Amino acid sequence: MAEICRVCMDISGKLVNIFDARRRTRVSIAEMIAQCTGFEVKRGDLFSEMICPQCYEDVKSAYGIRQTCEESHQFYCRVRDEGIEDALCALLEEEDWEISEDEDARIDSASAADDDGKSDSKKVAFECRECHKKYQRKGTFLRHMRTHMDGQSFPCPYCKRNFRLRVTLKAHMKTHNAAKPYECSHCAKTFAQQSTLQSHERTHTGERPFKCSQCSKTFIKSSDLRRHIRTHGSERPFKCSKCTKTFTRKFHLDNHFRSHTGERPFKCSHCPKAFAMKQHLKQHSRLHLPDRPFRCSHCPKTFRLSSTLKEHKLVHNAERTFKCPHCASFYKQRKTLARHILEIHK
């Protein structure tokens, strides 16, 4: 059986062992065959462990198509569940983790060749929708796409959202013009996509299905979990020039830096208050809204903020999770514990 190709059963003098670990592939030929066919492939199974050159090329091609289809399917699922901007940003972040220093050097060379127009004769696989530059390699293309994201902001003329890419702004603007058939049963807001409605409804129900395996924190969206997971990594490339703190994202560094400068650029349009962080302004702005869209599922109470609803729901929970550090008392809510400490232990 050693002289026969496992795939086509041809007899050839140039057969290659499918378990050969010396070949420059991230997965063995045996694993490629198993993934493409669904058959179990293992040493000593009494089948031939050899493959001919033509079948080897066919297996690599089939495996490549399978990988591409899987990656594309995952990306489209993210677009469906999270929107195009979060999906694209997640793709860029993941590629950034995978590119090594050696890969960076090769990408730089490839980028220079692309920019000089020396590679026009070769097949173009990726075209930038921002500036229409063309690239042959996915890594080069994604590296170029990041240049459009550095320091740029494209505001939506219909709402206050900002986007790092013009193409994601265009996709977002369609939501203002498109029909919004999906209505929230809690606050009557409508959405163009069912996935957006599902994410929104979690702000009412308090559901946070995406859990970090390292610290047990939970999140409403999978994109929020992915960003959080990066905080557990050892790499913290963004360093504060005023102190020794480091951060995994430039966004977090910018927020922290305002604690040194005292800058509060996010101003409320309803009152004189200003905030250092955009999310704090967003949370504050809801206090000016007349409606109280967050309704408790256990009683008739309604709230302006989802965080207030989450805190309130603890009242309906029999478990008392907040323990006083000074005595043996337990409380259902953090604010009740705080009141106890001020009144009894002050």
From Swiss-Prot:
Zn(2+) binds at residues 5, 8, 52, 55. GO terms for molecular function: DNA binding; DNA-binding transcription activator activity, RNA polymerase II-specific; DNA-binding transcription factor activity; RNA polymerase II cis-regulatory region sequence-specific DNA binding; zinc ion binding. InterPro entries: Znf_AD, Znf_C2H2_sf, Znf_C2H2_type. Keywords: Metal-binding, Phosphoprotein, Repeat, Transcription, Transcription regulation, Ubl conjugation, Zinc, Zinc-finger. Residues 3-79 form the ZAD domain. One of its GO terms (biological process) is regulation of transcription by RNA polymerase II. One of its GO terms (cellular component) is nucleus. SMART domains: zf-AD (SM00868), ZnF_C2H2 (SM00355). Disruption phenotype: RNAi-mediated knockdown in dopamine neurons increases dopaminergic mRNA levels of srl and its downstream transcription factors ewg and TFAM, and also results in a significant increase in mean lifespan (64 days) compared to controls (60 days). However, it has no effect on mitochondrial abundance, neuronal survival or climbing performance. Double knockdown with park or Pink1 in the dopamine neurons, improves climbing performance defects and rescues decreased mRNA levels of srl, ewg and TFAM in the single park or Pink1 mutants. A zinc finger (C2H2-type) spans 126-148, 154-176, 182-204, 210-232, 238-260, 266-288, 294-316, 322-345. Pfam families: zf-AD, zf-C2H2. Coiled coil: none annotated. Phosphorylated by Pink1 leading to ubiquitination by park. Ubiquitinated by park. Polyubiquitination by park leads to degradation by the proteasome which likely activates mitochondrial biogenesis to maintain neuron health and function. Transcription repressor that inhibits transcription of srl/PGC-1-alpha to negatively regulate mitochondrial biogenesis and thereby promotes neurodegeneration. In neurons, functions downstream of the Pink1-park pathway and is likely to act as part of the Pink1-park homeostatic mechanism that maintains mitochondrial quality and function through degradation (mitophagy) and synthesis (biogenesis). PANTHER family: TRANSCRIPTION FACTOR (TFIIIA), PUTATIVE (AFU_ORTHOLOGUE AFUA_1G05150)-RELATED (PTHR24408:SF58), ZINC FINGER PROTEIN (PTHR24408). Interacts with park. This is Zinc finger protein Paris. It comes from Drosophila melanogaster.
